[in-house]
Regions:
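Surface-exposed peri-terminal alpha-helical interaction modules
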Residues: 1-224
Length: 224
């Protein structure tokens, strides 16, 4: 399971310079250059999506649910008291793929906002669990990008490239929802709104992130 998760980050590594380039081009590049960068990003996301599906080859649902998940579920409220350390309960969310900077970085570059969905507050909170340099990278891109602003007033070609990039991320998140069902919901026999390892409502979080990604698409204008 963890090998497959690392595989997603490995597949996404070549996109880091693409994100940096697209962010820079959004400030002073041409529409054609920015469209090309977004096209490269969309192509790279195909490999990231394929890497996510490898989890089915590396770990079966029963093994994950019964032998892995109990140890990464975390301990939110009421927390756990560490004897000899503190009398106050320690509260920590469990291991979650949302703690990877990868997808948050992609959202930041494209200007995808999750504030209107429950996913937003959780995604912001888990940044505290990222390695500091990763968190700073996400913050820098989020503050420096003008991609969505440029696309809104850009050419049809640029808008189409942007929407294709969004569609690839949405497809990734849709695949993630299917995995969550097969690896958590189905083995538990529970309703879809059970909590994930991060402590959030699983179905609400995943569907919210997918919806805000899809909703970010821009209707192409008639500009050539």
């Amino acid at each position: 399971f963890f090998i497959a998760s690392m595989g997603v980050e490995l597949a996404g590594a070549p996109l880091l310079p693409v994100v940096a380039r697209a962010t820079a081009l959004s400030a002073d590049g041409s529409d054609a250059e920015l469209a090309a960068a977004l096209g490269h990003f969309a192509e790279g996301m195909v490999a990231v999506h394929a890497a996510l599906e490898h989890v089915r080859r590396w770990c079966d649902p029963a093994t994950y649910y019964l032998r892995v998940r109990p140890f990464v579920a975390g301990w939110p409220t009421p927390g756990v008291i560490y004897e000899g350390v503190s009398e106050e309960p320690q509260r920590h969310i469990g291991g979650s793929a949302a703690q990877s900077a990868l997808l948050q970085l992609f959202d930041a570059m494209l200007g995808v906002k999750h504030a209107d969905h429950p996913a937003g507050s959780y995604l912001r909170a888990v940044r505290a669990y990222m390695p500091p340099p990763h968190r700073r990278f996400v913050d820098d891109v989020e503050q420096g990008t003008r991609v969505r602003e440029r696309v809104t007033g850009g050419t049809v070609v640029l808008q189409q490239a942007y929407n294709e990039a969004l569609q690839q991320i949405a497809a990734f998140r849709e695949a993630h929802m299917r995995l969550a069902h097969d690896y958590i919901v189905a083995p538990s026999g529970a309703a879809r709104d059970m909590a994930g390892t991060g402590g959030t409502s699983l179905d609400t979080f995943l569907r919210g992130a997918h919806r805000s990604t899809s909703d970010a698409s821009i209707r192409p204008t008639s500009t050539p």
